[in-house]
Amino acid sequence: MEESDIYYWKGVAVRMAEQVERAVSPLVGTEDAGEIIKMGADGTPTKLIDLVAEDEAVGVLESTGRPVTIISEEIGVLHINSEGDEPGIIFVVDPLDGTSNAIRNIPFYGISVAVAERHPDGAAPTLNNVLMGFVKNFATGDLYWAIKGQGAFLNEKAISSSSQSSLDRTSLGAFIYGTRFRRVDSICRVIRRMRILGSVALELAYVASGSYDAFMDLRENLRIVDIAASKLIVEEAGGVVTNERGGEIDGLLNVKARTSLVAAGNLELHEKIMQTLEVI
């Protein structure tokens, strides 16, 4: 992607985050926010606040007048401003990550936006095609972002992941629902503390900034679209992201693709977490 295009699409992504934030703000903490409207393309119920967020995100892309594809949990895949060929630019969007938090007015929810470029040969796009990632915490206004090869940032300040490598001093975020208790218990016994905050994209952003030392989701049910932005941000900050077997996560950019995930601020800590999981 040309530098001018990077600058342009970065501006679009930031504007999308700002406009979605404004659109959902009146619904946060209200009973109406949780009303189920339909079933989303990913097979899960779409709530009113999700639909409002996604409609606003689509509107931002429509307003550019440029051909672009959006991939989102509720709508699936939509080609915008396009006639004929599939657009070369892809926005992978979770318009509201942490929906339950937003409905209950728990201040930990936001948007995840990844910008990818389609393979010239027409191959299906994967996580490796993601060039930019943006995760905004609507409750605080903080924007975590990265451009491939250019580092990671919190607002305008460069960030780096944690250098903590001792398990007994590690703060770990996790999504553990549906995970076998033995696996969770084995980790809890060796780390300092565990946090469960309810937004994977934002918790991975915490790994990137060093607020968390590590994060894991072992369900094999984590949507690729949910981590498309934050995976890049963690890696650009110096962190390590793999599946629970230590393999690369390079899933297809679609709403059906799922994975497990183990992220750490550095390779040494990641290896220690993997060793703990392997003995179970």
UniProtKB/Swiss-Prot annotation:
MF (Gene Ontology): fructose 1,6-bisphosphate 1-phosphatase activity; inositol monophosphate 1-phosphatase activity; metal ion binding
UniProt key word Metal-binding: yes
InterPro entries per UniProt: Inositol_monoP_metal-BS, Inositol_monophosphatase-like, Inositol_monophosphatase_CS
Short name of any one Pfam family annotated for the protein: Inositol_P
Record flagged with keyword NAD: no
Function statement: Phosphatase with broad specificity; it can dephosphorylate fructose 1,6-bisphosphate, and both D and L isomers of inositol-1-phosphate (I-1-P).
Protein family membership: Belongs to the inositol monophosphatase superfamily. FBPase class 4 family.
Protein name, entry field: Fructose-1,6-bisphosphatase/inositol-1-monophosphatase
Native source organism of the sequence: Methanothermobacter thermautotrophicus (strain ATCC 29096 / DSM 1053 / JCM 10044 / NBRC 100330 / Delta H) (Methanobacterium thermoautotrophicum)
Lineage of the organism: Archaea, Methanobacteriati, Methanobacteriota, Methanomada group, Methanobacteria
